[in-house]
């Protein structure tokens, strides 16, 4: 399939993301290349966390598109610090605010917004400034715009699969 680029009105590319207090990430700034980007690292270093944070951050853009559910920060995604109380126990302290700042290029202009949850008890995450929602609404409703795509495959799916039951070898008589 050949795409006639002259029909494209507006496209968006993620240039940079700044992640604060998301899962195991205290602070992380990532700059993205103009085309394909690949995160490589050992197990457990946060590759998937970066992508999950981006999906929440891009939810600020998606919030402008009607009838599309957006992903918010969950309690499990807020970074936790364990504080020793001195008697062999500990307290969990949730590090808020949790935020993702997205910096994108949109028609040769830089556009930035922050998706943030200010406290553990906040019911939703906020998007500031809200102008990104208006831009998304315009892009979704007018033909010729290329909406952003982010795709990742979490290994969490591997652990959630139902295991096949096997025969108990100790159930028979010896």
Each PLM stretch: what is its role?
Residues 1-174:
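P-loop NTPase switch/coupling surface
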């Amino acid at each position: 399939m050949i795409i006639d680029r002259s029909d494209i009105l507006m496209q968006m590319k993620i240039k940079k993301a700044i992640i604060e207090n998301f899962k195991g990430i205290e602070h992380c700034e990532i700059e993205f290349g103009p085309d394909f980007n690949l995160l490589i690292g050992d197990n457990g270093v946060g590759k998937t966390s970066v992508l999950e944070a981006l999906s929440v951050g891009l939810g600020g853009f998606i919030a402008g598109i009607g009838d599309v559910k957006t992903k918010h920060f969950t309690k499990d995604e807020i970074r936790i610090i364990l504080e020793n109380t001195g008697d062999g126990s500990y307290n969990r302290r949730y590090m808020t605010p949790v935020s993702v700042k997205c910096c994108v290029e949109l028609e040769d202009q830089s556009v930035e917004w922050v998706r943030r949850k200010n406290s553990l008890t906040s019911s939703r995450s906020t998007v500031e400034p809200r102008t990104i929602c208006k831009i998304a609404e315009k892009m979704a409703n007018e033909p010729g715009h290329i909406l952003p795509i982010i795709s990742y495959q979490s290994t969490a799916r591997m652990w959630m699969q139902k295991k096949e039951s096997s025969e108990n070898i100790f159930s028979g008589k010896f």
